[in-house]
Amino acid sequence: MERLNAEKAASLAIAVYVIIAFVFPFSAFAADFAHRLNSEKRSEKEGLGRNEVPLFKRIPGPGKEAVANKLIGLFKNSKTPITTQGTSKKQVKGNRLSIIGEDWFLDVNGDGTNVRYRNYKYLDSKPELAKSVSERLSNEKLEELGRVFIKQTLSEYIKIGANEELIPFYTEHAIGGGGQAKEGAPADEEKVYASTIVFTRSIDKVNIIGAGSKVAIMFNNKGTPVGFDYDWPQYRPTGKSQKVLPVEAIKNRAKKLASLDIDSPDVKVKRFDCGLYDAGVRKHDPKSVVQAGCAIHSYEKKIIDHDAYKRDKNSGHSVGAYTDFIPAGETVEEDGKWPQAMKMHGKNPVSRFAAPKDGPKLK
Protein backbone atom coordinates (compact mmCIF):
# COMPACT_ATOMS: atom_id res chain seq x y z
CA MET A 1 0.00 0.00 0.00
CA GLU A 2 2.77 2.48 -0.63
CA ARG A 3 2.65 5.27 -3.12
CA LEU A 4 6.02 6.15 -4.58
CA ASN A 5 6.79 9.52 -6.08
CA ALA A 6 10.00 11.27 -6.98
CA GLU A 7 9.24 14.79 -5.95
CA LYS A 8 11.46 17.14 -4.09
CA ALA A 9 10.99 16.79 -0.37
CA ALA A 10 10.33 20.46 -0.03
CA SER A 11 7.26 20.21 -2.22
CA LEU A 12 5.89 17.46 -0.02
CA ALA A 13 6.38 19.48 3.01
CA ILE A 14 4.74 22.86 2.54
CA ALA A 15 5.81 24.43 0.60
CA VAL A 16 5.67 20.44 5.59
CA TYR A 17 3.99 17.13 6.94
CA VAL A 18 6.22 20.15 4.17
CA ILE A 19 6.88 19.15 4.39
CA ILE A 20 10.45 17.70 4.45
CA ALA A 21 13.92 18.05 3.16
CA PHE A 22 17.10 16.26 4.07
CA VAL A 23 20.56 17.52 4.80
CA PHE A 24 21.49 16.02 1.45
CA PRO A 25 21.32 18.26 -1.63
CA PHE A 26 19.41 15.50 -3.37
CA SER A 27 15.91 14.61 -4.40
CA ALA A 28 13.81 12.31 -2.27
CA PHE A 29 11.52 9.40 -2.89
CA ALA A 30 8.52 9.46 -0.57
CA ALA A 31 6.31 6.49 0.22
CA ASP A 32 3.05 6.75 2.15
CA PHE A 33 1.78 4.13 4.56
CA ALA A 34 -1.73 2.75 4.15
CA HIS A 35 -2.97 4.77 7.13
CA ARG A 36 -2.14 8.06 5.45
CA LEU A 37 -3.71 7.03 2.15
CA ASN A 38 -6.87 5.78 3.85
CA SER A 39 -7.10 8.90 5.99
CA GLU A 40 -6.97 11.11 2.91
CA LYS A 41 -9.62 9.03 1.13
CA ARG A 42 -11.89 9.22 4.17
CA SER A 43 -11.26 12.95 4.58
CA GLU A 44 -12.13 13.62 0.95
CA LYS A 45 -15.50 11.91 1.38
CA GLU A 46 -16.37 12.49 5.04
CA GLY A 47 -14.09 15.15 6.52
CA LEU A 48 -13.35 14.09 10.10
CA GLY A 49 -15.87 11.29 9.81
CA ARG A 50 -17.70 12.31 12.99
CA ASN A 51 -20.03 15.07 14.13
CA GLU A 52 -18.18 16.10 17.27
CA VAL A 53 -14.68 15.88 18.73
CA PRO A 54 -13.25 16.50 22.22
CA LEU A 55 -10.91 19.46 22.69
CA PHE A 56 -7.43 19.07 24.19
CA LYS A 57 -4.65 21.21 25.61
CA ARG A 58 -0.92 20.64 25.18
CA ILE A 59 0.66 19.98 28.57
CA PRO A 60 3.81 22.16 28.86
CA GLY A 61 7.06 20.21 28.83
CA PRO A 62 9.80 20.36 31.49
CA GLY A 63 11.74 23.07 29.62
CA LYS A 64 14.47 23.04 27.01
CA GLU A 65 17.38 23.15 29.49
CA ALA A 66 16.12 20.13 31.42
CA VAL A 67 15.48 18.08 28.27
CA ALA A 68 18.82 19.04 26.70
CA ASN A 69 20.73 18.01 29.83
CA LYS A 70 18.96 14.64 30.00
CA LEU A 71 19.59 13.88 26.33
CA ILE A 72 23.25 14.87 26.61
CA GLY A 73 23.56 12.42 29.49
CA LEU A 74 21.64 9.71 27.66
CA PHE A 75 23.96 9.69 24.65
CA LYS A 76 27.31 10.68 26.19
CA ASN A 77 28.59 7.07 26.31
CA SER A 78 26.84 5.94 23.14
CA LYS A 79 28.80 3.78 20.70
CA THR A 80 26.36 4.54 17.89
CA PRO A 81 26.33 7.52 15.48
CA ILE A 82 23.83 9.19 17.84
CA THR A 83 26.30 10.41 20.43
CA THR A 84 27.02 13.49 22.52
CA GLN A 85 30.65 12.62 23.24
CA GLY A 86 33.42 15.20 23.16
CA THR A 87 33.44 18.92 23.76
CA SER A 88 30.42 21.03 22.97
CA LYS A 89 29.09 24.55 23.31
CA LYS A 90 25.67 26.04 23.95
CA GLN A 91 23.89 28.63 21.87
CA VAL A 92 20.53 30.22 22.62
CA LYS A 93 18.54 31.91 19.90
CA GLY A 94 15.01 32.91 20.80
CA ASN A 95 13.20 29.81 22.07
CA ARG A 96 15.83 27.41 20.70
CA LEU A 97 18.69 25.94 22.71
CA SER A 98 21.44 24.40 20.56
CA ILE A 99 24.17 22.12 21.84
CA ILE A 100 26.90 21.94 19.19
CA GLY A 101 29.52 19.21 19.35
CA GLU A 102 32.50 18.55 17.11
CA ASP A 103 30.48 16.33 14.76
CA TRP A 104 26.91 16.59 16.02
CA PHE A 105 24.27 19.02 17.19
CA LEU A 106 21.16 18.91 19.34
CA ASP A 107 18.37 21.49 19.15
CA VAL A 108 15.70 21.73 21.84
CA ASN A 109 12.85 24.16 21.27
CA GLY A 110 10.27 25.89 23.41
CA ASP A 111 9.15 23.92 26.45
CA GLY A 112 11.33 20.93 25.58
CA THR A 113 8.74 18.94 23.63
CA ASN A 114 10.45 19.67 20.29
CA VAL A 115 13.89 18.14 19.67
CA ARG A 116 16.21 17.62 16.72
CA TYR A 117 19.51 15.66 16.63
CA ARG A 118 21.95 15.20 13.73
CA ASN A 119 25.42 13.72 13.22
CA TYR A 120 26.23 15.05 9.77
CA LYS A 121 29.90 14.10 9.84
CA TYR A 122 29.02 10.44 10.22
CA LEU A 123 26.70 10.59 7.21
CA ASP A 124 29.26 12.45 5.12
CA SER A 125 32.00 9.98 6.04
CA LYS A 126 30.14 6.87 4.89
CA PRO A 127 29.55 7.23 1.13
CA GLU A 128 30.33 3.54 0.74
CA LEU A 129 27.03 2.74 2.46
CA ALA A 130 25.05 4.20 -0.44
CA LYS A 131 22.83 1.67 -2.24
CA SER A 132 20.82 1.57 -5.41
CA VAL A 133 17.25 2.83 -5.15
CA SER A 134 15.89 -0.70 -5.56
CA GLU A 135 17.83 -1.77 -2.45
CA ARG A 136 16.40 0.95 -0.19
CA LEU A 137 14.98 -0.04 3.18
CA SER A 138 11.33 -0.99 2.85
CA ASN A 139 8.49 0.78 4.63
CA GLU A 140 7.96 -2.31 6.76
CA LYS A 141 11.63 -2.47 7.80
CA LEU A 142 11.75 1.24 8.59
CA GLU A 143 8.63 0.94 10.73
CA GLU A 144 10.20 -1.95 12.64
CA LEU A 145 13.48 -0.06 13.15
CA GLY A 146 11.67 3.12 14.13
CA ARG A 147 9.48 1.45 16.73
CA VAL A 148 12.49 -0.28 18.29
CA PHE A 149 14.43 3.00 18.53
CA ILE A 150 11.49 4.84 20.06
CA LYS A 151 10.83 2.07 22.58
CA GLN A 152 14.45 1.53 23.58
CA THR A 153 15.77 5.09 23.41
CA LEU A 154 13.03 7.73 23.33
CA SER A 155 10.27 6.15 25.43
CA GLU A 156 10.67 8.80 28.14
CA TYR A 157 9.89 11.49 25.59
CA ILE A 158 7.53 9.72 23.15
CA LYS A 159 4.77 8.69 25.52
CA ILE A 160 1.58 7.09 24.24
CA GLY A 161 -1.43 7.97 26.38
CA ALA A 162 -4.76 6.27 26.92
CA ASN A 163 -6.71 5.79 23.69
CA GLU A 164 -3.68 6.98 21.70
CA GLU A 165 -1.77 5.19 18.94
CA LEU A 166 1.66 5.66 17.37
CA ILE A 167 1.04 5.33 13.64
CA PRO A 168 3.53 5.03 10.75
CA PHE A 169 2.79 7.90 8.39
CA TYR A 170 5.31 7.97 5.53
CA THR A 171 8.96 7.41 4.65
CA GLU A 172 11.48 9.41 2.65
CA HIS A 173 14.70 8.28 1.01
CA ALA A 174 17.48 10.76 0.23
CA ILE A 175 18.60 10.12 -3.34
CA GLY A 176 21.83 11.25 -4.99
CA GLY A 177 23.17 10.80 -8.51
CA GLY A 178 21.22 10.57 -11.73
CA GLY A 179 23.14 13.40 -13.38
CA GLN A 180 25.98 13.46 -15.89
CA ALA A 181 29.58 13.91 -14.80
CA LYS A 182 30.16 15.67 -18.12
CA GLU A 183 28.22 16.37 -21.27
CA GLY A 184 27.66 13.25 -23.33
CA ALA A 185 28.57 10.90 -20.49
CA PRO A 186 26.07 8.31 -19.23
CA ALA A 187 24.03 9.36 -16.21
CA ASP A 188 25.37 8.33 -12.82
CA GLU A 189 23.36 5.70 -11.01
CA GLU A 190 20.89 7.09 -8.49
CA LYS A 191 21.67 5.90 -4.98
CA VAL A 192 20.02 6.06 -1.56
CA TYR A 193 22.12 7.67 1.17
CA ALA A 194 19.67 7.67 4.09
CA SER A 195 16.05 6.87 4.87
CA THR A 196 13.61 8.44 7.31
CA ILE A 197 10.35 7.22 8.76
CA VAL A 198 7.78 9.65 10.15
CA PHE A 199 5.22 8.56 12.74
CA THR A 200 2.12 10.44 13.82
CA ARG A 201 -0.43 10.01 16.59
CA SER A 202 -4.16 9.44 16.80
CA ILE A 203 -6.45 10.01 19.78
CA ASP A 204 -9.59 7.89 19.83
CA LYS A 205 -8.91 7.10 16.16
CA VAL A 206 -8.74 10.79 15.20
CA ASN A 207 -5.45 11.81 13.56
CA ILE A 208 -3.34 14.70 14.77
CA ILE A 209 -2.55 16.96 11.80
CA GLY A 210 0.07 19.71 11.84
CA ALA A 211 3.62 19.68 13.18
CA GLY A 212 2.62 18.44 16.62
CA SER A 213 2.60 14.73 17.46
CA LYS A 214 5.24 13.82 14.91
CA VAL A 215 8.43 11.81 15.41
CA ALA A 216 10.95 11.07 12.65
CA ILE A 217 13.93 8.72 12.79
CA MET A 218 16.68 8.79 10.14
CA PHE A 219 18.65 5.62 9.35
CA ASN A 220 21.60 4.77 7.17
CA ASN A 221 21.31 1.85 4.77
CA LYS A 222 22.49 -0.60 7.43
CA GLY A 223 19.52 0.34 9.58
CA THR A 224 21.62 2.30 12.07
CA PRO A 225 19.90 5.40 13.49
CA VAL A 226 21.79 8.60 12.66
CA GLY A 227 19.29 11.30 13.61
CA PHE A 228 15.86 12.02 14.99
CA ASP A 229 13.26 14.77 15.32
CA TYR A 230 10.13 15.00 17.39
CA ASP A 231 7.43 17.39 18.47
CA TRP A 232 5.60 15.26 20.99
CA PRO A 233 3.62 16.76 23.87
CA GLN A 234 1.25 15.09 26.25
CA TYR A 235 -2.37 16.20 26.01
CA ARG A 236 -5.07 16.70 28.61
CA PRO A 237 -8.80 16.78 27.83
CA THR A 238 -10.47 20.13 28.42
CA GLY A 239 -13.81 18.52 29.19
CA LYS A 240 -15.31 20.41 26.26
CA SER A 241 -16.18 19.28 22.76
CA GLN A 242 -16.61 20.89 19.35
CA LYS A 243 -19.21 20.19 16.69
CA VAL A 244 -17.62 19.55 13.29
CA LEU A 245 -18.73 20.85 9.90
CA PRO A 246 -19.66 18.39 7.13
CA VAL A 247 -16.97 17.96 4.50
CA GLU A 248 -18.57 20.17 1.85
CA ALA A 249 -18.83 23.05 4.32
CA ILE A 250 -15.15 22.58 5.22
CA LYS A 251 -14.21 22.73 1.54
CA ASN A 252 -16.28 25.87 1.06
CA ARG A 253 -14.49 27.44 4.01
CA ALA A 254 -11.16 26.43 2.45
CA LYS A 255 -12.04 28.35 -0.71
CA LYS A 256 -12.14 31.52 1.40
CA LEU A 257 -9.12 30.82 3.60
CA ALA A 258 -6.62 28.89 1.44
CA SER A 259 -3.52 30.61 0.08
CA LEU A 260 -4.42 29.67 -3.50
CA ASP A 261 -7.67 29.87 -5.42
CA ILE A 262 -8.46 26.18 -5.28
CA ASP A 263 -11.22 26.61 -7.87
CA SER A 264 -8.68 27.82 -10.43
CA PRO A 265 -7.83 25.37 -13.25
CA ASP A 266 -4.15 26.18 -12.60
CA VAL A 267 -4.36 24.99 -8.99
CA LYS A 268 -4.20 21.33 -8.03
CA VAL A 269 -5.03 19.98 -4.58
CA LYS A 270 -2.48 17.29 -3.77
CA ARG A 271 -3.65 16.27 -0.31
CA PHE A 272 -6.68 16.82 1.91
CA ASP A 273 -6.53 15.34 5.41
CA CYS A 274 -8.66 16.07 8.46
CA GLY A 275 -8.16 15.56 12.19
CA LEU A 276 -7.22 17.47 15.33
CA TYR A 277 -4.84 20.33 14.56
CA ASP A 278 -1.68 20.83 16.62
CA ALA A 279 0.67 23.39 15.09
CA GLY A 280 3.68 22.18 17.09
CA VAL A 281 5.42 24.00 19.91
CA ARG A 282 7.13 26.57 17.70
CA LYS A 283 3.80 27.80 16.30
CA HIS A 284 1.68 27.09 19.36
CA ASP A 285 -0.48 29.63 21.15
CA PRO A 286 -0.33 28.54 24.83
CA LYS A 287 -3.88 29.81 25.34
CA SER A 288 -5.27 27.76 22.46
CA VAL A 289 -6.79 24.29 22.32
CA VAL A 290 -6.20 21.41 19.94
CA GLN A 291 -9.33 21.51 17.78
CA ALA A 292 -10.76 20.19 14.52
CA GLY A 293 -9.04 21.11 11.27
CA CYS A 294 -8.17 19.94 7.79
CA ALA A 295 -4.82 20.24 5.99
CA ILE A 296 -5.04 21.15 2.33
CA HIS A 297 -1.85 20.85 0.27
CA SER A 298 -2.16 22.67 -3.04
CA TYR A 299 0.12 23.93 -5.77
CA GLU A 300 -0.16 26.34 -8.67
CA LYS A 301 1.69 26.15 -11.97
CA LYS A 302 2.27 29.43 -13.80
CA ILE A 303 3.67 29.69 -17.32
CA ILE A 304 6.27 32.46 -17.37
CA ASP A 305 7.88 31.88 -20.78
CA HIS A 306 5.37 30.35 -23.17
CA ASP A 307 7.95 29.71 -25.90
CA ALA A 308 10.32 27.92 -23.54
CA TYR A 309 7.46 25.93 -22.05
CA LYS A 310 6.26 24.92 -25.51
CA ARG A 311 9.73 23.56 -26.33
CA ASP A 312 10.24 21.86 -22.98
CA LYS A 313 7.47 21.24 -20.44
CA ASN A 314 10.10 21.17 -17.67
CA SER A 315 11.07 24.80 -18.21
CA GLY A 316 9.44 28.18 -18.65
CA HIS A 317 7.18 27.93 -15.62
CA SER A 318 7.10 28.31 -11.85
CA VAL A 319 5.34 26.24 -9.22
CA GLY A 320 4.09 27.59 -5.91
CA ALA A 321 3.08 25.06 -3.24
CA TYR A 322 1.33 25.70 0.06
CA THR A 323 -0.14 23.85 3.00
CA ASP A 324 -3.09 25.54 4.68
CA PHE A 325 -4.78 24.35 7.85
CA ILE A 326 -8.50 25.08 7.71
CA PRO A 327 -10.57 25.18 10.92
CA ALA A 328 -13.26 22.50 10.73
CA GLY A 329 -15.38 23.27 13.78
CA GLU A 330 -18.83 24.82 13.52
CA THR A 331 -17.58 27.27 16.13
CA VAL A 332 -13.86 27.97 15.86
CA GLU A 333 -11.92 28.39 19.10
CA GLU A 334 -9.58 31.37 19.24
CA ASP A 335 -5.92 30.76 18.39
CA GLY A 336 -3.56 33.71 18.18
CA LYS A 337 -1.01 31.86 16.05
CA TRP A 338 -3.28 30.05 13.60
CA PRO A 339 -3.76 32.46 10.67
CA GLN A 340 -6.95 30.90 9.35
CA ALA A 341 -8.54 30.71 12.81
CA MET A 342 -7.64 34.36 13.38
CA LYS A 343 -9.41 35.32 10.17
CA MET A 344 -12.50 33.46 11.37
CA HIS A 345 -12.52 35.83 14.34
CA GLY A 346 -12.10 38.91 12.16
CA LYS A 347 -8.40 39.34 12.90
CA ASN A 348 -5.67 39.86 10.32
CA PRO A 349 -2.64 37.58 10.76
CA VAL A 350 0.80 38.79 9.69
CA SER A 351 0.83 36.17 6.93
CA ARG A 352 -2.24 34.53 5.49
CA PHE A 353 -0.37 31.34 4.75
CA ALA A 354 2.12 31.22 7.61
CA ALA A 355 1.37 27.56 8.09
CA PRO A 356 3.82 25.57 10.25
CA LYS A 357 5.54 22.60 8.74
CA ASP A 358 3.53 19.43 9.02
CA GLY A 359 6.17 17.41 10.74
CA PRO A 360 9.67 17.60 12.17
CA LYS A 361 12.35 19.46 10.25
CA LEU A 362 14.56 16.90 8.58
CA LYS A 363 16.98 19.08 6.68
What are these regions (language model features)?
Residues 13-25:
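Bacterial N-terminal signal peptides
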Residues 29-196, 203-204, 229-255, 305, ...:
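Preferential activation on post-signal-peptide N-terminal prodomains/segments
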Residues 104-110, 215-219, 272:
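Broad, structure-driven detector of short, well-ordered beta-strand segments within folded domains
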Residues 197-199, 206-215, 219-230, 235:
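Extended amphipathic alpha-helical interaction segments
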